[in-house]
Amino acid sequence: MTTSGVPFGMTLRPTRSRLSRRTPYSRDRLPPFETETRATILEDHPLLPECNTLTMHNAWTSPSPPVEQPQVGQQPVAQQLDSDMNLSELPGEFINITDERLARQETVWNITPKNMSVTHDMMLFKASRGERTVYSVCWEGGGRLNTRVL
């Protein structure tokens, strides 16, 4: 016996679980399917919410009503952003993609995992509502550029 508790001549070989922990990005053993699977069919579905990350999901809201201008002596009200401009509506000068004329607000839901429910053996999640600014511009021919800022 050695001091580690393993007899002479016997060595510890790494088990499958140890190897998988060291190389989590190993290649799939099966080739990809040639036919569409359910996940690829739903990938660009127009009725499903857009999912930019694993924790953020869009919640489409109706456009906000126009903001009234403040009267003399009143504090200015924060302007609600709601814009979808076309490049032909803008002057011919250079325009920054983060120009306020191109901005609108979107509601997002941040989903974070909570603890696991012991009784039902299922994972619980917490959803918190947030806002993000989206700068959007479109041009003739159907092109569009969106920049999302959290």
Swiss-Prot record:
Interacts with host E2F proteins. GO terms for cellular component: host cell nucleus. A motif (Nuclear localization signal) lies at residues 1-58. Its main location: host cell. Modulates viral and host transcriptional activity to promote viral genome replication. Stimulates viral E2a promoter activity by binding and inducing dimerization of host E2F. During viral infection E1A protein binds to cellular retinablastoma (RB) family members and dissociates these repressors from a complex with E2F proteins. Free E2F is then bound to E4orf6/7 which leads to transactivation of viral E2 promoter, and cellular promoters such as E2F-1 promoter. Activation of cellular E2F targets promote cell cycle S phase and thereby possibly favorises viral DNA replication process. It is found in: Host nucleus. Keywords: Early protein, Host nucleus, Transcription, Transcription regulation, Viral transcription. It comes from Human adenovirus C serotype 2 (HAdV-2). Belongs to the adenoviridae E4-orf6/7 family. The lineage of its organism: Viruses, Varidnaviria, Bamfordvirae, Preplasmiviricota, Tectiliviricetes. Residues 1-31 are annotated as: Disordered. This is Early 4 ORF6/7 control protein. GO terms for biological process: viral transcription. It comes from the Viruses. Coiled coil: none annotated. The keyword Transcription regulation applies.
